[in-house]
Swiss-Prot record:
GO MF annotation list: spermidine synthase activity
Lineage, top ranks: Eukaryota, Fungi, Dikarya, Ascomycota, Saccharomycotina
Gene name per UniProt: SPE3
Keywords of the record: Polyamine biosynthesis, Spermidine biosynthesis, Transferase
CDD domains registered for this protein in UniProt: AdoMet_MTases (cd02440)
Similarity-based family: Belongs to the spermidine/spermine synthase family.
EC number of this enzyme: 2.5.1.16
Domain PABS: 12-248
Protein name: Spermidine synthase SPE3
Length: 293
């Protein structure tokens, strides 16, 4: 009989997401039906469990990255905010995002000819194919190319190459901390074509305003257009997470989609994103707007 898999974050059948640095004094808990997999990869602790209400859950270094029930909200927004702010995206790069969810959204755009993914940890890709098949299905798409390695080096090797670059990073602790700094945005800028657009994960305005202010400042020093937007998603801390959306084209209004499709086509392609949500996601509550604008 196979031995039951245990993990220190799971106590009395409940997974607890606790961080004294990123969200002190609060925690997300999910009831665990079964632990599916646990390993320590070369870079991080990888846990996958089946929850009673949110399907399979991917956890990296004790932090929820995706659940089958709500992942589409984040993946759709981080991808389509960028892709629909570019007039004709042909070559797209995803940094991180080894679960494949962002790639799945990228290849929905007919204009895209190449969709690259660069992730440092092969374990996330391998395990997502096994346990998150709806997210990872895009790895078999003919437009998709995968590179296992360091995002910084990849960007240095591909100057002036990509129309859109999407950074699907974890929180700014440990290896991901450098993805929130000015040097990284300068590398992104250099790897973009003339009217290039980026989106990057940008934390929750409810608990991370100082981080977001620094992030917006770093982006604004590199890109002429740098705006903050957000999405609601129940299994991320505070139920919201934000994005920086930036363009090299100073005339670009990232707050309105450049290319629109019919309502019927939207309903067919997306479960969260639509043209109205695109615009609304940049409208911030009064207190947050005061801090960030």
């Amino acid at each position: 009989m196979a031995q039951e898999i245990t993990h220190p974050t799971i106590v009395d059948g409940w997974f607890r997401e606790i961080s004294d640095t990123m969200w002190p004094g609060q925690a997300m808990t999910l009831k665990v039906e079964k632990v599916l997999h646990h390993e320590k990869s070369k870079y991080q602790d990888v846990l996958i469990f089946k929850s009673t209400t949110y399907g399979n859950v991917l956890v990296l270094d004790n932090v929820i990255q995706a659940t089958e029930r709500d992942e589409f909200a984040y993946q759709e927004m981080i991808a389509h905010l960028a892709l629909n702010s570019h007039p004709n995206p042909k070559k797209v790069l995803v940094i991180g995002g080894g679960d494949g969810g962002v790639l799945r959204e990228v290849v929905k755009h007919d204009s895209v000819e190449e969709a690259w993914l660069c992730d440092i940890d092969e374990a996330v890709i391998r395990l997502s194919k096994e346990y998150l098949p709806e997210m990872a299905a895009s790895y078999s798409h003919p437009k998709v190319k995968t590179h296992i390695g360091d995002g910084f080096q990849f960007l240095r090797d591909y100057q002036n190459t990509f129309d859109v670059i999407i950074t699907d990073s974890s929180d700014p602790e440990g290896p991901a901390e450098t993805l929130f700094q000015k040097e990284y945005f300068q590398l992104l800028n250099s790897a973009l074509t003339e009217k290039g657009v980026i989106t990057t994960q940008a934390e929750s305005m409810w608990i991370h305003l100082p981080i977001i202010k620094d992030l917006k400042k770093a982006c604004s020093e590199v890109f002429p257009v740098a705006e903050y937007s957000f999405v609601t998603i129940p299994t991320y801390p505070t139920g919201t997470i934000g994005f920086m959306v930036c363009s090299k084209d100073k005339t670009c209004n990232v707050k309105k989609p450049l290319r629109e499709i019919s309502d019927e086509k939207e309903a067919e392609l997306y479960r969260y994103y639509n043209k109205k949500i695109h615009e609304a996601s940049f409208v911030l509550p009064t207190w947050a707007a005061k801090e960030l604008n």
